[in-house]
Amino acid sequence: TYESVEEIRNLISTLSKDVLVIIDEAYIYYETSVEVPTARAVLDEFPNVFIMRTFSKAYGLANYRVGSMMSSAELANYIQTIRLPYNLNTLSQVAAEAAFGDREFL
């Protein structure tokens, strides 16, 4: 279900600042009915928000278990401290780099 950035902003503003909000933009590349489908703008207002995207849908990399994340620097630094045991293998990293670099494919 697509929610507008304003609806997302309104929801987040009602939550406690210690609640982690994860916005799933797995299908962002398929959304054509709005001018700016991403909730990226809320990252500047709310430091407790993650926006996550998968490469399995638009990039066709379901078997590689790769994606991307946007967040405040503070949350990104925290993720770096726990990421290592769950890091990607080399093949997944190479596939993700190649897919991400091929903007014409999208």
Short names for language-model regions:
Residues 1-21, 27-58:
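Active-site pre-lysine segment of PLP-dependent enzymes
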Residues 48-106:
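PLP-dependent aminotransferase class I/II
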